[in-house]
UniProtKB/Swiss-Prot annotation:
Residues 190-200 have a biased composition (Gly residues). It is found in: Nucleus. Component of the Mediator complex, a coactivator involved in the regulated transcription of nearly all RNA polymerase II-dependent genes. Mediator functions as a bridge to convey information from gene-specific regulatory proteins to the basal RNA polymerase II transcription machinery. Mediator is recruited to promoters by direct interactions with regulatory proteins and serves as a scaffold for the assembly of a functional preinitiation complex with RNA polymerase II and the general transcription factors. This is Mediator of RNA polymerase II transcription subunit 22. The gene is Med22. The keyword GTP-binding does not apply.
Length: 200
């Protein structure tokens, strides 16, 4: 722990005044309370009448009770002054509190980072296993070279399109064959007509 630096003269004087106020107020409370206890004790007969003595004791108790209240208020004011002094002048304690808070936050950040890294690794492993299971279950759709699933579906679509293209000409072949037969029909219809003339 670093050695505490010496306070400036003004601060040292202020602390001494606070210490003196504390001692004076405590002494005032103790003295007045002791005198109130003494006044409450019944004394022997004196030259002063009991009524007069009673009024005097009552007045003295009120005064000493007021002194106790004043000393208590002074102590409360002293506590407030000490808090203000510590807030405004106790920079080492403030810096230490800030450092402790920073260390706590750093430790929390490191813990969160470790948990996130662990979660990332677990998710990566699970995702890899799911991908392997998915591609192995769809291996029947792939070729021998183990194409990706999207390319396998793409090739299946191409095969289906080519099959449709081959079946269409087969169905249309009778219609195409009717053309030459219809074109040959006029030849037979003119069979009774004169034949072509020969040129010499």
């Amino acid at each position: 722990m670093a050695q505490q630096r010496a306070l400036p003269q003004s601060k040292e004087t202020l602390l001494q005044s606070y210490n003196k106020r504390l001692k004076d107020d405590i002494k005032s409370i103790m003295d007045n309370f002791t005198e109130i206890i003494k006044t409450a004790k019944i004394e022997d007969e004196t030259q002063v009448s009991r009524a007069t003595q009673g009024e005097q004791d009552n007045y003295e108790m009120h005064v000493r009770a007021a002194n106790i209240v004043r000393a208590g208020e002074s102590l409360m004011k002293l506590v407030s002054d000490l808090k203000q002094f510590l807030i405004l002048n106790d920079f080492p304690s403030v810096n230490e509190a800030i450092d402790q808070r920073n260390q706590q936050l750093r430790a929390l950040q490191e813990e969160c980072d470790r948990k996130l890294i662990t979660l990332r690794d677990e998710v990566s492993i699970d995702l890899y296993e799911l991908e392997e299971e998915y591609y192995s279950s769809s291996s029947s759709l792939c070729e021998a070279n183990d194409l990706p699933l999207c390319e396998a579906y793409w090739r299946l679509d191409l095969d289906a399109d080519s099959a449709d293209g081959l079946s269409a000409p087969l169905l249309a072949s009778p219609e195409t064959g009717a053309g030459p037969l219809q074109s040959a029909a006029p030849v037979h219809s003119h069979g009774g007509g004169p034949g072509p003339t020969e040129h010499t």
